[in-house]
Amino acid sequence: AEAGELIAVIGPSGSGKSTFLTIAGGLQSPSSGDVIINGNHLSALKEKKRASLRLKEIGFVLQSSNLIPFLSVKQQMRLLDKVKKDNLKKDQLKDMYESLGIGDLLNSFPSDLSGGQRQRVAIAKALYTDPSIILADEPTASLDSDRAFEVMDLLKSATKKNRKTTIVVTHDTRLIDYCD
């Protein structure tokens, strides 16, 4: 996949889609073959280097939005600043909040948000660290059709606008139209 492309891996439950993502994201090693991210062969890297590459180059969007329940949206982002430096600048962050439609939710906690809002915050978290790759594991699974399409519109828009490579794994064939 190239920068600015959104691609999907589609298959039935149990077909290995999530396993593929954990391997592509450097969380698991392949039994054969290799994953190369920006010239780095993941299987050749020691765990510490692989973790560093993962933090710098990969943003994850999970099926369950994976937000910390006791932190507001704004605090979720600040926590990322403690783990990784050189995240989006304030003006870029403000633009991202607006483009994802979460600018007015910054002081809200996950329990105050709808499923679609939580997924938009999860996308914001994945984009905030400015990775080159977004890996999304069934990002629309818990959403109704309208919200699922909204999330895919946002992922596609963010992919194009920010020149990211986005890989979505899903069993939902309705999402094919969003892919390159």
Please place each PLM-identified region on the residue numbering.
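Helix-to-loop junction immediately C-terminal to a conserved catalytic motif
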Residues: 25
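Conserved ABC transporter NBD signature motif
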Residues: 33-41
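Conserved signature/switch motifs of ABC ATPase nucleotide-binding domains
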Residues: 55, 108-111, 129
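Short coil-to-helix segment of the ABC ATPase nucleotide-binding domain corresponding to the Q-loop/switch region
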Residues: 71-78
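Conserved ABC ATPase signature
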Residues: 109-119
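Catalytic Walker B motif of ABC-type/P-loop ATPase nucleotide-binding domains
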Residues: 134-137
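Helix N-cap at the start of a conserved alpha-helix in ABC-type nucleotide-binding domains
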Residues: 145-147
